[in-house]
């Protein structure tokens, strides 16, 4: 920063310095002899880098005495510098008006034709800048749509707003990831279904591929094949053990007339069935 002259005169600055040191001593020590205190400690601090001062003893705070001149007062400002050149005064009185006209005449005499051309060119540039619409700074918050034209211009042009999200975390990216995941799952399921269908078709033969039999179908009437096979089977001879068991059964059955009748009826039915088979 450039140096500036002080705003107060030398006597005023000296008074402020004395008042500041007096009040600082009163706040620190509290004794009445400000000058004597300074004279007593001045010899100890003559050499630079002396020993550190001892720690101050704990004392009870005393009320600060009043200064010689009371509270510090602001000194009057310095008088303006004396010189021949003084700025012209604006308005108020004939002298001011005369000074203003004189200043305008000096300013007009200072500008040449080249300077006037530059001034006119600068003024024309200012007019052009004021008439042309400046580009609005990028907005970080949504702005309302005033008309259809503004909506179209905003949607067709690239957005200047700064994106505060990281890549892959906005709603569109998350939705795209979910859709891609579901599509992959569906593709895997369809692939499994196709494999299952192909394996089922390979395991079950096609009935159209079976060879056709050239023999004519035969109509079965009367006895079935099972009856013919029964006819051909010969009865095995009964062993001695089976004969004894049959005799015992017959002896037991002869005791009851009802059982005898039942056995006779069953034997009659068997004989009739056998006769029918042999007749056929």
Curated annotation (Swiss-Prot):
<feature type="compositionally biased region" description="Low complexity">
    <location>
        <begin position="252"/>
        <end position="266"/>
    </location>
</feature>
<dbReference type="Pfam" id="PF05501">
    <property type="entry name" value="DUF755"/>
</dbReference>
<protein>
    <recommendedName>
        <fullName>Probable protein VP2</fullName>
    </recommendedName>
</protein>
<feature type="compositionally biased region" description="Basic residues">
    <location>
        <begin position="227"/>
        <end position="251"/>
    </location>
</feature>
<feature type="compositionally biased region" description="Pro residues">
    <location>
        <begin position="65"/>
        <end position="81"/>
    </location>
</feature>
<dbReference type="Pfam" id="PF02957">
    <property type="entry name" value="TT_ORF2-like"/>
</dbReference>
<feature type="region of interest" description="Disordered">
    <location>
        <begin position="46"/>
        <end position="167"/>
    </location>
</feature>
<dbReference type="InterPro" id="IPR004118">
    <property type="entry name" value="HEV_TT_vir_Orf2/Gyrovir_Vp2_N"/>
</dbReference>
<feature type="compositionally biased region" description="Acidic residues">
    <location>
        <begin position="106"/>
        <end position="117"/>
    </location>
</feature>
<keyword id="KW-0597">Phosphoprotein</keyword>
<feature type="compositionally biased region" description="Gly residues">
    <location>
        <begin position="90"/>
        <end position="100"/>
    </location>
</feature>
<feature type="region of interest" description="Disordered">
    <location>
        <begin position="200"/>
        <end position="280"/>
    </location>
</feature>
<dbReference type="InterPro" id="IPR008474">
    <property type="entry name" value="DUF755"/>
</dbReference>
